[in-house]
A protein has these predicted regions:
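Conserved, mostly hydrophobic/aromatic
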Residues: 3, 31, 35, 43, ...
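N-terminal beta1-alpha1-beta2 module of alpha/beta enzyme domains
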Residues: 1-65, 69-71, 165-168
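Hydrophobic faces of well-ordered beta-strands that scaffold small-molecule active sites
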Residues: 3-7, 39-41, 71-73, 101-105, ...
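Alpha-helix-loop-beta-strand connector modules within alpha/beta enzyme cores
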Residues: 52-73, 127-130, 339-350
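Active-site mouth loops of central-metabolism enzymes
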Residues: 7-22, 76-84, 164-174, 233-235, ...
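Glycine-rich, proline-tolerant flexible connector loops at the mouths of alpha/beta enzymes
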Residues: 38-62, 77, 194-199, 323-334
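Flexible, glycine-rich active-site loops centered on histidine and acidic residues
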Residues: 2-19, 79-146, 150, 189-192, ...
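An alpha-helical appendage that flanks or caps ligand/catalytic pockets
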Residues: 125-158, 200-317, 350
Length: 350
């Protein structure tokens, strides 16, 4: 198993944006010092839920101060961007970093964000599909020729090409069974999270669907990776870990519930009906439920090691994206968590 750090760049009250951004960048820069394999900033807009509107800008800064850590996105929301610009930006980042890019992509889900950009959320799937194909062609074709519903290009030379050949690994965020199947059909790596209304057993079942689809479409499952976003915190003791991590986690869920779907009383968005029921669930969820379902793994180091080992054995996850820097948790607590992960947890799980 490999280990990464997910960064939402959330902005709860009480800290300036400058403080929050500086702290999260410092943690990302120190990731390789503490033995982590990757860092993954997440794109979000227009609320305290997340203020990293441009992961590529964030990662360009990290690329110049690190040597080994992989530079992932968790994720870039493709319907908000012109695909040629995405291809150019991440090809340049791949060149600047010497081939360390891991491009995570998704179609987005927050109505506030779609409205802010004037994008029709009901068309997110078709925008995502076209954008993804264009990005891959930009990276692999000498000249870009493409005729789609939303994008058309004729004999376009897109440069630079990525450092990695044929291109950086691409990861697709998946929630529904259909999206797991799509990732398998396309031969993409997979990003998933039991945070979003599921369980570890449910995740294992969907990963099985993904791997079966890979094989049935001519892709070798052993060459594709599965990354899991898990809220993980290693404390000095079981009780202290809960005391330190419960408040940030509950802040996250209450904030997530504000933006995941249309407001109560408003109609569900076509193609996103499930998110309305998710909104109601996350607004009512309590800490003990999160721990029981495996959404949160929090405790002293032996407990965290055991639970992560169960996750690995049950699901076959290759890459843990530790979701710890959330809800305004302090920089000092984050450093302590990273030190314990390095010393007591990661060595036995690699």
């Amino acid at each position: 198993m490999k280990f990464g750090l997910l960064h939402l760049f959330e902005s709860p009250a009480g800290r300036t944006e400058k403080q929050m951004i500086d702290e999260q960048v410092a943690l990302m820069e120190s990731a390789e010092e503490y033995g982590f394999d990757s860092v993954w900033p997440a794109e979000h807009h227009f609320s305290e839920y997340g203020v990293c509107g441009s992961p590529v800008v964030n990662l360009a800064a990290i690329a110049r101060t690190t040597k080994k850590v992989r530079l992932g996105t968790g994720v870039v929301i493709l319907p908000f961007h012109h695909p040629v610009r995405v291809a150019e930006d991440f090809a340049m980042l791949d060149q600047l970093s010497g081939g360390r890019v891991e491009l995570g992509v998704g179609r987005g889900y927050q109505p506030l964000e779609f409205g802010g950009f004037g994008v029709d959320q009901t068309r997110s799937t078709e925008l995502f599909d076209e954008s993804l194909e264009v990005i891959q062609r930009c990276w692999t074709d000498e000249r870009l020729n493409y005729q789609g519903q939303h994008y058309q290009f004729e004999d376009l030379e897109v440069r630079p090409k990525p450092f990695q050949e044929p291109h950086p690994p691409i990861w697709m965020a998946a929630l529904s069974e259909g999206s797991f199947e799509k990732a398998g059909r396309l031969g993409l790596n997979l990003l998933l999270s039991p945070v979003f209304g599921g369980s570890l057993q449910g995740a294992a079942d969907l990963i099985k669907v993904y791997r079966e689809t890979l094989a049935s479409h001519g892709h070798d499952p052993t060459t594709r990776q599965v990354g899991a976003l898990v809220m993980t915190y290693a404390g000095k003791t079981q009780e202290q870990a809960r005391e330190e991590f419960a408040r940030p986690v509950m802040w996250y869920f209450r904030t997530f519930g504000k933006y995941v779907a249309p407001k109560v009383g408003q109609p569900a968005i076509k193609g996103y009906e499930w998110y309305t029921s998710m909104r109601d669930a996350v607004n009512a969820v309590e800490w003990d439920q999160l721990v029981e379902h495996g959404t949160v793994i929090c405790g002293e180091t032996d407990y965290v090691t055991e639970r992560l080992s169960e996750l690995k054995q049950l699901t076959g996850v290759d890459h843990l994206l530790g979701w710890t820097r959330l809800g305004g948790i302090s920089h000092e607590l984050m450093i302590g968590h990273m030190e314990r992960m390095q010393a007591s947890i990661m060595p036995s799980l690699r």
